[in-house]
Structures are given as C-alpha cells and as structure tokens.
Amino acid sequence: MVGLVGGGGWRVGDDAAGGGGGGAVAAGAAAAAEAEHMRRLHSHAPGEHQCSSALVKHIKAPVHLVWSLVRSFDQPQRYKPFVSRCVVRGGDLEIGSVREVNVKTGLPATTSTERLELLDDDEHILSVKFVGGDHRLRNYSSIVTVHPESIDGRPGTLVIESFVVDVPDGNTKDETCYFVEAVIKCNLTSLAEVSERLAVQSPTSPLEQ
C-alpha cells in the first residue's frame, strides 16, 4: 500500500484487490484508474535534491464523508493523530489561508506553518504547502485527492496522497521518503477509521456516492 520514489517515478500498492478471475479484472481496472488519477492530478517535478512519493488508501465509506474530513484545512486533527491543535490566521478559509499546527510529542517537530494552495470541492482536491515551522521538511508540498469507487457493492472511496520535499542535509532520498510515508500512512489509516465509523453512524444506500 506504500509507494516509494527515489527520483520521480511511482510505485503504488493496491490494498483492496480481490481474489479469483473477477477480482483480477477488478484489480486491473482499479490500477488503471489510479494511474490515470495520478497522471492527471498528482504530477510533481522533483528537483535533484528532492524526493517525491504517493500513497493510496481504499476506504469503505462514501466519498462525501471522506472528503468532509480531508477538506477540513482548519481542523486537520479530526483525523490526523499527530496534530494536537490548529489555528487558521485571520479565521477565514480560502486559497492562501495559513494555519499554525501544533504537533504532538513523538515527532521531531512541535510546530508547522502551512498554506492552503488549492481546495476544489468539485474535483475533491486539497493541496497544502509547508511555509514554516521547526521541522526539517523544507519546500514540502502535498496533494490529496479522493475518488468514488465501489467496494463489495457499497460506496467506497479511493484516496491518493502525493508529496514532494527537499532532502535534508545528512539524509538520503529513500530515508526522507520513508519518514514522510510513515506519517502519511498513519494519517490515512486514521482517516479510514474515522470515515468508516461515520459511515456506520450515517448509513447510505448502495447507489449513493
């Protein structure tokens, strides 16, 4: 399920592939859809001293529930376990808004200043760039997209999160990607848990997206 990139390519895993012939066909179609989403929406151009990577997550909850969490630029702690507090400067939520995030103990940082680059409710795209903080993730930029899909005949959601970031002095590209991917993987796992809990509390029909 984790994708690792050393210089600009992609390796994306599928954690919802089924077994048997029908499962293989479905998995192939899902992989093709993921590749198209990445080509269209997740194009990064990492420099010589940067790394880029992408992760995917299949969530058993309808896209509107998942997107309601992902789009919460002012409340990332709704699903991100390492965020303890978030304040948006000025209070208004719009492109260019900046948030001050406090990070829980356990990560090599306590604060992060982040700017909203894109929030598209039609295409379900969120893009954020780190512009300050006491971390080492310089020029970090991420894109998160969510896409409706069917999982076991029920409304599900494919989430893709990609990023590009400078490689800190003293670290390799693989080390940098491994660290960032570990954090994103925790976030996506939590996103799935929260979304699926909300889906149980607010059941939808099989055709609702």
UniProtKB/Swiss-Prot annotation:
Q: What tissues express this gene product? A: Expressed in leaf sheaths and leaf blades. Expressed at low levels in roots, flowers and seeds.
Carries keyword Oxidoreductase?
no
List GO BP terms, alphabetically.
Answer: abscisic acid-activated signaling pathway; response to osmotic stress; response to salt stress; response to water deprivation; seed germination; seedling development
Q: Which InterPro entries does this one have?
A: Plant_def-hormone_signal, Polyketide_cyclase/dehydratase, START-like_dom_sf
Keywords for the protein's UniProt record, in alphabetical order: Abscisic acid signaling pathway, Cytoplasm, Disulfide bond, Nucleus, Protein phosphatase inhibitor, Receptor, Stress response
Q: Which CDD domains match?
A: PYR_PYL_RCAR_like
Q: What SUPFAM superfamilies does this protein map onto?
A: Bet v1-like
Keyword hit for Disulfide bond: yes
Q: Where in this protein does the record put region START-like?
A: 44-196
Which GO MF terms does the UniProt record name?
Answer: abscisic acid binding; protein phosphatase inhibitor activity; signaling receptor activity
Q: What induces it?
A: Repressed by abscisic acid (ABA) and drought stress.
Q: Where is this site: Involved in interactions with PP2Cs?
A: 108, 172
Q: Name one Pfam family in it.
A: Polyketide_cyc2
> At what residues does the UniProt record annotate the site feature described as Involved in ABA binding?
81, 180
Q: Report the main location listed first in the record.
A: nucleus
Find motif (Gate loop) and give its ranges.
Answer: 105-109
Determine the domain of life of the protein's source.
Eukaryota
Q: How does it assemble?
A: Monomer. Interacts with PP2C30. Binding to PP2C30 is dependent on the presence of abscisic acid (ABA). Interacts with PP2C51. Binding to PP2C51 is dependent on the presence of ABA. Interacts with PP2C50. Binding to PP2C50 is dependent on the presence of ABA. Interacts with PP2C53.
Task: Tell me which family the UniProt entry assigns to this protein.
Answer: Belongs to the PYR/PYL/RCAR abscisic acid intracellular receptor family.
The record describes the protein's role as: Intracellular abscisic acid (ABA) receptor that functions as a positive regulator of ABA signaling pathway. Together with ABI5, PP2C30 and SAPK2, is part of an ABA signaling unit that modulates seed germination and early seedling growth. Acts as a positive regulator of abiotic stress-responsive gene expression. Inhibits the protein phosphatases PP2C06 and PP2C09 when activated by ABA.
The protein in question is named Abscisic acid receptor PYL5
Tell me the organism: Oryza sativa subsp. japonica (Rice)
